[in-house]
A protein has these predicted regions:
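Phosphate-backbone recognition surface of nucleic-acid-processing proteins
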Residues: 92, 106-211, 215, 225-228
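Intrinsically disordered or highly flexible coil/loop and linker segments, enriched in small
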Residues: 34-44, 48, 80, 160-163, ...
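Helix-hairpin-helix/helix-loop-helix acidic hairpins
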Residues: 42-101
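Basic, amphipathic alpha-helical segments enriched in Lys/Arg and hydrophobic/aromatic residues
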Residues: 205-242, 246-257
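Acidic, Ser/Thr-rich low-complexity intrinsically disordered segments
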Residues: 257-265
């Protein structure tokens, strides 16, 4: 008698649950970007009297009426995907400034926290590493070591903390005060001086200090994502390189940033 042998199913190239969540998050931000960018464009043209203001407002209102309900539906679906995830339940859901869409992006792009043995590797993946004293940037002909979409997501996290954060907004304010007292990045930059001459001046630009503060806070936040997720999963956790090797004294523990009573965004 001939025996039928059933071949094992082929190994998937990706975790379908993770990729499903990622596609939902990307769809949400793609639609939001279309709405915001188009509205900004028509309003800008109206301000330059290229387009009638009434028409610009009609277009903006139409976009909002059409796309905001779709964004809301996607947000609801994303919430269903993330609500049972360990790092959402244990950490992300308790942070002001992090809603289901940002959390969904973080969870889906990281996938398995076990593949990041150190927080430095996670920082680099999100474009937060410091290379030769500077943040890593795209260079023609060179391989990048970060995910450009993750870098954008990290930027969105920072903007959200500034707008609606609490504990991390407080940390941002502290960093602003620190960098102002320090004189910005501590370096001098070429600026225009008297009579149009180029001179070296200390870094005190508000925009630069703002970006430095956001970057510092976002790095601490992703350190907290890494630590909390690994602790919850029972994986080993090490101190960041600046603490362990460079002797930096300030360490922010993730549990100190849990905010009880937070309303889901």
């Amino acid at each position: 008698m001939k025996t039928n042998h059933t071949a094992p199913p082929p190994k998937r190239k990706a975790d379908w649950g993770v990729t499903r969540l990622r596609e939902l998050v990307e769809a949400y931000y793609d639609i939001q970007d279309v709405r915001v960018q188009t509205s900004n464009r028509v309003q800008n043209r109206a301000s330059k009297e290229i387009l009638e203001p009434k028409t610009a407002n009609e277009i903006s209102d139409l976009l909002a009426a059409t796309l905001k309900p779709l964004e809301s539906n996607l947000q609801t679906r994303i919430m269903k995907e993330v609500k049972d995830h360990v790092v959402w339940q244990g950490f992300l859901s308790k942070v002001y400034g992090i809603g289901p869409c940002l959390a969904g992006g973080i969870i889906s792009w990281i996938g398995d926290i076990g593949r990041f043995e150190t927080v430095s590797k996670l920082w680099r993946y999100f474009g937060l590493a410091v290379i030769d004293g500077h943040s890593e940037r795209l260079k023609a002909g060179e391989k990048i070591h970060y995910n450009p979409k993750c870098k954008i997501l990290a930027w969105k996290v920072g903007q959200s903390f500034v707008k609606v954060g609490k504990a991390y907004r407080g940390l941002y304010d502290n960093k602003i005060a620190f960098y102002k007292a320090k004189g910005g990045c501590g370096k001098e930059h070429e600026r225009e001086g008297e009579e149009g001459k180029r001179v070296m001046k200390p870094c005190v630009e508000t925009g630069h200090i703002h970006n430095m503060a956001i970057r510092a806070v976002v790095k601490i936040f992703f350190q907290h994502v890494w630590c909390s997720w690994r602790e919850i999963k029972g994986l080993p956790v090490t101190d960041p390189y600046p603490i362990a090797k460079l002797g930096h004294a300030t360490y922010y523990y993730w549990k100190d940033f849990l905010e009880k009573g937070k309303t889901i965004l």
